[in-house]
């Protein structure tokens, strides 16, 4: 009898887990859970074990070629490159077939995204300008964590109009493109010509695979792995390899099959339920030891939090409103400016993407206090943006 009861409970638990992973908000919930676990571990008696685990040396060697990095660097440089493969595929799909495929569709979220990148950077600079050592952090509040933002929106999915979801997705995709440009231009150092030549050869091979509409995903994975390793060694940030790989996968194969859709379907689950939660677990572990009230007034913390809480909504909403009033763009049918403002506030959730940019802006040499304050600023700004965004979205969609 007890054996049957155990089986029944096991089946019930499995069904609950399956139901959870089918939820639209599952990815966002898992991200939040991973971040909370990381913070609990970082502030518990297990904090040393947590940090030791993240700093485990992991090596990959093939002949004379080797990559030696700590586990956290493998997560940030390796796993996040896989995430950017997905970003590259999503951007390509939207540019050729989706919400960004025509000028009329693309211009409104494009202008909004520009505002959402420029104004947070300006807010950051204005607050942090008195300390030159903080200058590199201007890009941190530019980012939007699309997984979290869509997760919050999914909590109200039944009352959120479809055009508003499309606007948020298009906005986030253009935001990601902006982040890619920023990484390429400002966070690539000490370039190796030899590694860049290997990277160029790998890119040419990917272009040829795309040109001949090769549908075998394993071919892109093998060449993509070579490209990633070459880009990593070149001094250019390795996540850019992910974007190039994503763009190289064809929308349609020779026989009408859709390789990009197939690969996107495979990667989306891995990204939502493994890669991003793992990134959050590795980067959200902020220790509150030694933090006092005076730190709240730190220029770095205030600059990042203000960039996300104030800069994002002001930039996105302000540029959106002006673009319509000046006749540069048209407000999408079915949504209003109050809902645009709610989405603009929601885009202040920088979380994993902001932490990723912070890891590039401030390396280990910047000091523990700088890294801690930057993560605290991101957590504060993202939390406030999530709460306010949810409340504004609930109110504006209910009124509509």
UniProtKB/Swiss-Prot annotation:
Q: Name one GO molecular function term.
A: sodium:proton antiporter activity
Instruction: Kindly state which reaction or reactions the protein catalyses.
Output: Na(+)(in) + 2 H(+)(out) = Na(+)(out) + 2 H(+)(in)
Query: Which Gene3D superfamilies does UniProt cross-reference here?
Result: Na+/H+ antiporter like domain (1.20.1530.10)
Which parts pass through the membrane? Answer: 26-46, 71-91, 107-127, 137-157, 166-186, 189-209, 212-232, 233-253, 273-293, 299-319, 340-360, 373-393
Q: Mind telling me which Pfam families this protein's record contains?
A: Na_H_antiport_1
Q: Which PANTHER family match?
A: NA(+)_H(+) ANTIPORTER NHAA, SODIUM ION/PROTON ANTIPORTER NHAA-RELATED
Q: Describe the task this protein carries out.
A: Na(+)/H(+) antiporter that extrudes sodium in exchange for external protons.
Q: Which NCBIfam families match?
A: NhaA (TIGR00773), PRK09560.1 (NF007111), PRK09561.1 (NF007112)
Name of the protein this chain belongs to? Na(+)/H(+) antiporter NhaA
From what organism does this protein derive? Haemophilus influenzae (strain 86-028NP)
Q: Which gene encodes it?
A: nhaA
């Amino acid at each position: 009898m007890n054996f049957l009861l155990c089986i029944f409970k096991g089946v019930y638990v499995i069904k609950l887990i399956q139901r959870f992973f089918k939820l639209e908000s599952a990815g966002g919930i898992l991200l939040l859970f991973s971040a909370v676990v990381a913070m609990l571990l970082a502030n518990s008696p297990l904090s040393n074990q947590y940090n030791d685990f993240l700093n485990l040396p992991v090596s990959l060697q093939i002949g004379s070629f080797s990559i030696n990095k700590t586990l956290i660097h493998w997560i940030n440089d390796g796993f996040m490159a896989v995430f950017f493969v997905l970003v590259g595929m999503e951007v390509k799909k939207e540019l050729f077939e989706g919400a960004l495929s025509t000028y009329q569709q693309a211009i409104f979220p494009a202008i909004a995204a520009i505002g959402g990148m420029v104004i947070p950077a300006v807010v950051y600079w204005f607050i942090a300008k008195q300390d030159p050592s903080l200058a590199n952090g201007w890009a941190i509040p530019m980012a939007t964590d699309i997984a979290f933002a869509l997760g919050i929106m999914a909590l109200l999915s039944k009352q959120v109009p479809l055009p508003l979801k499309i606007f948020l997705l298009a906005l986030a995709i253009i935001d990601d493109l902006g982040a890619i440009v920023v990484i390429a231009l400002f966070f690539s150092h000490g370039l190796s010509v030899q590694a860049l030549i290997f990277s160029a050869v790998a890119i040419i091979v990917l272009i040829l695979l795309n040109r001949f509409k090769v549908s075998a995903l394993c071919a892109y994975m093998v060449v993509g792995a070579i490209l990633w390793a070459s880009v990593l060694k070149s001094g250019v940030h390795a996540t850019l390899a992910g974007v190039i790989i994503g763009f190289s996968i064809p929308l349609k194969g020779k026989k009408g099959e859709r390789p990009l859709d197939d690969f996107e379907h495979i990667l989306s689950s891995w990204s939502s339920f493994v890669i991003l939660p793992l990134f959050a677990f590795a980067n959200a572990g902020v220790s509150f030891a030694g933090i006092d009230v005076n730190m709240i007034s730190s220029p770095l913390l205030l600059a990042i939090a203000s960039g996300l809480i104030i800069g994002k909504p002001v930039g996105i909403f302000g540029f959106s409103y002006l673009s319509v009033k000046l006749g540069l763009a048209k407000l999408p049918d079915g949504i209003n400016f109050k809902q645009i403002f709610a989405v603009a506030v929601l885009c202040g959730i920088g979380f994993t993407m902001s932490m990723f940019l912070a890891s590039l802006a401030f390396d280990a040499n910047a000091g523990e206090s700088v890294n801690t304050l930057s993560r605290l600023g991101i957590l504060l700004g993202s939390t406030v943006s999530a709460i306010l965004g949810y409340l504004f979205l609930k109110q504006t969609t209910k009124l509509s």
